[in-house]
Structure formats: C-alpha cells, structure tokens
A protein has these predicted regions:
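Patatin-like phospholipase
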Residues: 1-46, 54-284
Length: 284
C-alpha cells in the first residue's frame, strides 16, 4: 500500500458534475482522496454533484455516504425511497410529490425534507469545507452561484431538471438545474486552490444504440447531449489540472438501483484519479 500524501501538499479543489444516477460514481472519487489521506480545500457541484458535494463538505466520508446510499436503495422497511427498488418511473414520481402542473411534474418536497433531516447543517457557513453550488436562472438564462446563506434550497434548485421538477424561487429568481448552464463547474475553483479536479459523469454511449428510445429517455438524453457539448467546449479553453470521466455504460438518469454496476464501472477511474494526484503532488 502506498504511503499517504503529507498534509503539506498543495491545496486541492474538486468539482462534482451533473449526471443523475451516474453521480454515484462521485463517491468513488471521494474514496480516492480518502485513500490518499487528502481533503479538498474547496468543492463545487452541479445537479447531483451539488447533493454529493454538500454531504462531503458537511464532513461525510465516502464510507458514510455509501452507507446512506445502501439504506436508500436497500431499505429494510418502507421508506420514501422505496421507489428505488422498482424501475417504474411512476414510483419515482410518487416519492417526489408528483403534481401535474405546468411548472413541472415533481415538487421534490419529500427529498428536500430528507436532506434537511440528514445533513447536520442548513447554511453554507456551517460546512466544514467551502462549497459552491450552481443553478440556472430560468428567465435570465444565466448561471447563479451559491456559496453563502441557506444551503437546502440552492441544492434543490441545482438538481431541478426542467420539465420534471418544479423550479425553485430564491430571492425573486426562478431557478432550475445547474446542469443547464454549467454541468461541470470546475471553473469556480481556479482562484481558490492549487490543483483543480473535475469529475465528469455525463452520459457515454448506450449499448442499445439501434433502438428507438422511450419518451423520457429521449428527453433526458437530449439534455445530456447538450451538457456534453457545454463541457467539451469549455475544456477547449479552460482545462482542470485533473479531468476524470468514468466510463459508465447503460445507466440512465434515474437508474439508482444500478449502484453496484456504477461502482464496478467507475473503479478504474478511481485508480486513475489516485495515480494522477500522486504524480502532481510528488512534483510539488
């Protein structure tokens, strides 16, 4: 086993990207840092990355977050997350307070309550690690960055997929999913650390490329294609010090029940992150 990196190493910033269930892979990237005895000095997140980033910034280890995930997808008793045992998207809607209204199918108040009950903090200032969360101003079509004040509502805004979740109103701004403008917000880290890490969990090709996709799949895949384009264009002009993209196949936006498959497929990316970090830190 390799020696842990000394605490005098340069400061690290890590960005957790959007990607739905594939965001489970973020936990392996946190494990990579844990294995090396490292903690970031700054975190940024968009959509599912904002959720993971909040728990990490609040002090949860990768192991603790895995335990929470296991409770959610393998509940021993009935819970609001029982939908995860089913593939039927209608069950998912039920869990998230479905309301067939013009602003979106899902209110998301149950999940918001879950966040409030499990996160030990409710404000950015109470986090152990500084965190920046990205959402999108629907009407102004611009990025909104949160790093102070209330924590829970910005998280909800950041994962509010347009047309599915109802938008979130914060200070007279109507906000939707951060992935619409910045699905991998590593650019927010560059002035706050020596080494920037970007974890991209946007979709790669599906195996069933010749099939006509179901309605929801086609909508989400189109949205993810847009996210891929945003990230690829940004990488041309501003590169993080370490860019990691786990090769996760056949995992759709709400395939949280495929956690074991995601962990298996993302394992090589975890080892890649460790190797790249060791190289950079040993040069310092």
């Amino acid at each position: 086993m390799k020696n842990k990196i000394v605490s005098s190493a340069p400061s690290i910033g890590i960005s957790f990207g959007a990607g739905g269930a594939r965001g489970i892979a973020h936990l392996l990237m946190i494990e990579a840092l844990d294995d090396l005895g490292l903690k970031p000095s700054i975190i940024s997140g968009s959509s599912i990355g904002a959720v993971v980033g909040a728990f990490y910034a609040a002090g949860f280890s990768a192991k603790e977050m895995r335990e929470i995930l296991n409770q959610l997808i393998n509940p021993k008793s009935d819970s609001v997350f029982d939908f995860l045992l089913k593939s039927d998207i209608v069950k998912l809607f039920t869990m998230f307070d479905p309301q067939f209204i013009k602003s979106g199918f899902i209110k998301g108040e149950k999940f918001q309550s879950y966040m409030k009950s499990h996160l030990p903090v409710s404000r950015f200032e109470e986090l152990k690690i500084p965190l920046k969360i990205v959402a999108t101003d629907y009407w102004k079509k611009e990025e909104v960055i949160f790093d102070k004040g209330d924590l829970i509502n910005p998280i909800k805004a950041s994962y509010s997929l347009p047309g599915l979740f109802t938008p979130v109103k914060i200070k007279n701004r109507i906000l939707i999913d951060g992935g619409a403008v910045n699905p991998l917000p590593y650019d927010l880290l560059k002035n706050d650390c020596h080494i920037t890490i970007a974890i991209d969990v946007t979709a790669v090709k599906m195996q069933s490329e010749n099939e006509i996709p179901p309605t929801f799949d086609s909508v989400f895949t189109t949205y993810q294609t847009m996210q891929n384009s945003i990230i690829n264009e940004r990488l041309k002009f501003l590169k993080p010090d370490i860019y990691i993209r786990p090769e996760i196949y056949d995992v759709r936006v709400f395939d949280f029940v495929k956690a074991d498959l995601i962990f298996k497929q993302a394992q090589p990316a975890k080892e890649e992150l460790k190797r790249k970090l060791e190289v950079l830190l040993n040069k310092s």
